[in-house]
Design a protein with these regions (language model features):
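Sequence/structural segment immediately N-terminal to covalent heme-attachment motifs in c-type
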Residues: 32-36
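Short beta-strand His + acidic residue motifs that chelate non-heme Fe in jelly-roll/DSBH
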Residues: 46, 145-147, 166, 184-190
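Ligand-binding loop in jelly-roll beta-barrel domains
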Residues: 182-206
Length: 220
């Protein structure tokens, strides 16, 4: 994806460091990966973190292997082949109308489902019934997401349109990061709406009864 404007909102250093060291959960990795595809600045910062991580690994004292390590490895070689994975939808087959991030390649992507007035979501398979959730969100122009807070960090990468949250405007290529406990109520651009790739760690907590009602039905 080629952008014609500078990216002004990025994941913070803690998120990028976790990405570099492999400790960031898969849902958030997919969103950060999407951001890195469009953001040279974050790719550069990530390179610095990866270099630091490499130095830290080299500085660690070697750890002795368990006495049965070889036997356990050999046992896995004798184990039967796991069944082939079920066929999955690919981003190329997903009728989104926009270019999907390469970070979603190979991920199963569900169909758009009505979630709330003017809002549809598409779940990333395998990342819905877990603590970490990843999904695409499509909001019609001028739609307000129900007021909510959440247990963990929420990341939203803008793929189309624009989003306004906490008086900040996020456009294509931007990554909106909301910290745990932040109560917020983003709304989509009044002219274009928006499509975002979102990762949430933990539960969201709608502040209003309408949001709680919706949550009962869609388990977000
Ligand atoms: Zn960035």
């Amino acid at each position: 994806m080629t952008l014609t404007r500078p990216i002004t909102h990025h994941p913070d250093d803690g998120v990028l460091l976790a990405y570099a060291t492999g400790t960031l959960g898969l849902a958030h990795r997919l969103v950060v990966g999407a951001h890195l595809e469009t953001c040279p600045a974050c790719r550069s910062r990530l390179g610095g973190f990866e270099a630091v991580g490499g130095v830290m690994l080299e500085a660690q004292a070697p750890v002795a292997l368990a006495s049965d390590a070889l036997a356990r490895v050999l046992a896995t070689l004798d184990a039967p082949e796991p069944p082939p994975p079920a066929p999955r939808l690919t981003p190329a087959s997903f009728p989104l109308g926009i270019e999907l991030p390469k970070s979603l390649a190979g991920q199963g992507i569900g169909p758009w489902r009505w979630t709330a007035p003017g809002i549809e979501i598409s779940k990333i398979e395998g990342l819905w019934k877990t603590r970490e959730r990843c999904f695409l969100l499509r909001a019609a122009p001028g739609v307000t997401v129900p007021h909510h807070d959440h247990d963990g960090v929420e990341l939203a990468q803008l793929l189309a349109g624009a989003l306004v949250d906490e008086n900040q405007r996020f456009e294509v290529g931007d990554c909106a990061q909301a910290e745990p406990g932040l109560r917020h109520q983003p709304h989509s651009d009044p002219e274009h709406g928006c499509i975002c790739l979102i990762a949430i760690d933990g539960r969201t907590r709608p502040s209003h009864w309408t949001g709680r009602l919706i949550q009962r039905f869609i388990d977000i």
